[in-house]
Amino acid sequence: KITGHIDYEERYACSSAAGGLKMISIGLVPELTAQASREASLGAGAKVWKTYSFNLTKGDMREIEEYHPDIILLTGGTDGGNSECILYNAQMLSSLSYDCPIVIAGNRCAAEECQEILGERTTFLCENVMPKLGELNIEPTQKQIREIFLKRIVQGKGLSEASDLVSGIIMPTPSAMLTAMELLSDGWEELSGIGELVGVDLGGATTDIYSIAEGSPANMGTVMKGIQEPYAKRSVEGDIGMRYSVHGILEAVGDRRLSK
């Protein structure tokens, strides 16, 4: 047993921050900007509760109020394309009863007007997550989401004091896992990586899947449709885990199969 003062050269800590980062994403078309919005949120380490498409309804707003997300990602339209939807949704979000940080990453021709509509609410302007049809640009938005997480959410959950006690950086656990997968795949400095990979992170409440790959089809005659998949990707099964969400496994496989 050791008592008294202990000198540390470095201190490291690993913890899931009180349930993680709760987000909702809003886009225009489900298969395009709404999907791009979701990819940006998941890649930043967020738990995406729901993705909304087209114009928000009063029922949608009641759901958002009830869920009380930490961050809202507002997207919609390619640059120079549809602007009516994102402007309408900005107007709907202006009625929120609390000041939730809103990241605006849609049609650049409407972004500043969205910010004006939202008035004194906390907003952040980012590059469009889909500037051209089928073209993803999610890295700037992911960076902004991580910064909001560290500056606002971490402080709000009482972890700002912990940052003074540990060495290195503080980052969301899913984001750290994605970075680790990229290092394992691509290597670092003189160390070679192992190449394309799929990683599975089994948690108590969720199961995260990480993919580091170009995703190019093996058959040269394959025609690609939809948005381009990111090289480094995270997806999450929010209702399948080893402890808190173990009921999700039971529902997915059935009690008879699980008993075997």
Please give the residue ranges for each predicted region:
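Nucleotide/phosphate-binding catalytic cleft detector across ATP-hydrolyzing
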Residues: K1-E196
